[in-house]
Swiss-Prot record:
GO terms for molecular function: bile acid binding; calcium ion binding; calcium-dependent phospholipase A2 activity; phospholipid binding; signaling receptor binding. It catalyses: a 1,2-diacyl-sn-glycero-3-phosphocholine + H2O = a 1-acyl-sn-glycero-3-phosphocholine + a fatty acid + H(+); 1,2-ditetradecanoyl-sn-glycero-3-phosphocholine + H2O = 1-tetradecanoyl-sn-glycero-3-phosphocholine + tetradecanoate + H(+); 1,2-dihexadecanoyl-sn-glycero-3-phosphocholine + H2O = 1-hexadecanoyl-sn-glycero-3-phosphocholine + hexadecanoate + H(+); 1-hexadecanoyl-2-(9Z-octadecenoyl)-sn-glycero-3-phosphocholine + H2O = 1-hexadecanoyl-sn-glycero-3-phosphocholine + (9Z)-octadecenoate + H(+). Pfam families: Phospholip_A2_1. Belongs to the phospholipase A2 family. Its EC number is 3.1.1.4. This is Phospholipase A2. GO terms for biological process: antibacterial humoral response; antimicrobial humoral immune response mediated by antimicrobial peptide; arachidonate secretion; defense response to Gram-positive bacterium; fatty acid biosynthetic process; innate immune response in mucosa; lipid catabolic process; phosphatidylcholine metabolic process. Gene3D superfamilies: Phospholipase A2 domain (1.20.90.10). Monomer or homodimer. It comes from the Eukaryota. CDD domains: PLA2c.
Amino acid sequence: MKLLVLAALLSVSAAAHIITPRALWQFRDMIKCAIPGSRPYSEYNNYGCFCGLGGSGTPVDELDRCCEIHDACYTQAKHLESCKSVIDNPYTNSYSFSCSGTNIICSSKNKECEEFICNCDRAAAICFSKAPYNENNKNINKKERC
């Protein structure tokens, strides 16, 4: 019985790991649409107090504030009934969007959770495109500055 439960947990975990990179790639692609030539993972991960995994404290600048707002948007999404399952949640759910120039369009065919997450990512990508990037806020000491 214990082996059956363990197998079920591992299969759910494996499914989440398969889906997660796709969801992250979509956000990355959205940022690349809004900011052509950008390198989202290397530029925005571990930037300020909120960009990257987790986040707390006070944003260090406008760009970091974009990440704080994005985190809050995902928190709101988790309260939607349609975003509460293992697969349909902000961190693993994929959605449909298109890019025309630097214009990001979330598909009208997205379901409720997908639409909400797509719009969270869209708003963040647009916010990133308008915020100045300060190299001094990359890989900061979060204990001291956040």
